[in-house]
A protein has these predicted regions:
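Membrane-spanning helices that line or support transport/gating and their immediate boundary helices
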Residues: 30, 34, 89, 99-103, ...
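Short cytoplasmic-facing helical segments at TM-TM junctions of multi-pass membrane proteins
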Residues: 146, 150-189, 212, 216
Length: 264
């Protein structure tokens, strides 16, 4: 499909924005600038990071790093999606579930992923399982809260109309509640996927020999500064791409929402 002029303009603007960021990074790092409390004296310039990236691409460990991280993120995300959406639908529709579950979940929600590391090691003997658990915790609450928000945001007039027409509870859920809450659920899934990658470095600090987060942390310990930025950029690109894929799939599964939003 041919790109429209507005899409070309948008892509061009984004490319210019990225180029400007790289240019600023180059100037600050090569000049070893000091901006108040922030110094760029030890920040490698883009050219050095580019060389480190090419070195990683040519390394046989790249596939092992990527496959390990992708498996951990996928396992944590799928588990969080099943539990988060299920609990969110239950809490959103059931007053008793809300009273019983929401308060404990709200207490646990602000705890950062790094604080779960000691407990994850104690609860889960497998280091691989512990790493998956950290990514699971990171993704769970964005998915859960967005699902609850989506269910609570269903127009009560739609529910009342469906009930007045004799719609059964299961059909009411499948034909009114779930489609109305779906856009918010997809948003939660997209945010949750991004949070999974955000927690990856924390998760792979536990143990392991492979993974993009482990590669980033190991680069810091050996003071390979360019490799740190390479790892950060890889995590950022993978997180952005996977979140965009979820958003794209959600739009294709929700033609009613896409039409209302005016986007294809």
């Amino acid at each position: 499909m041919r790109a429209t002029p507005s899409q070309v303009w948008r892509w061009g603007a984004q490319a210019i924005s990225l180029a400007a960021c790289v240019l600023v990074w180059h100037v600050l790092s090569t000049q070893q600038a000091h901006l108040g409390l922030v110094t760029f004296a030890n920040v490698p310039p883009p050219a050095e990071v580019w060389d480190a990236a090419w070195e990683l691409v040519g390394s046989p460990k790249l596939s092992q790093h990527l496959s390990s991280s992708l498996l951990r993120v996928a396992s944590g995300f799928v588990s969080a999606s099943v539990l988060g959406v299920g609990l969110g639908l239950l809490i959103g529709r059931s007053r008793w579930a809300r009273l019983a579950l929401l308060a404990p979940l709200e207490v646990v929600r602000p705890i950062p992923a790094v604080a779960w590391i000691p407990l994850a090691i104690l609860m889960i003997p497998s280091s691989e399982g512990s790493m998956v658990f950290i990514t699971f915790v990171g993704a769970l609450f964005p998915i859960l809260l967005n699902t609850i928000h989506g269910v609570n945001g269903v127009d009560p007039r739609l529910v009342a109309s469906a009930r007045s027409l004799g719609t059964s509870p299961w059909r009411l859920f499948g034909q009114v509640i779930l489609p109305s809450a779906a856009p918010s659920i997809v948003t939660g899934l997209s945010i949750g996927m991004g949070t999974c990658w955000f927690c990856l470095v924390t998760a792979e600090m536990i143990s392991g020999q492979y993974g993009i987060g482990y590669y980033t942390w190991e680069s810091y310990t050996v003071q390979a500064y360019a490799n740190i930025i390479v790892g950060m950029l890889v995590i950022g690109l993978l997180g952005m791409g996977s979140s965009a894929l979820i958003h794209w799939g959600g739009q294709r599964l929700m033609p009613w929402h896409r039409t209302q939003g005016g986007q294809a």
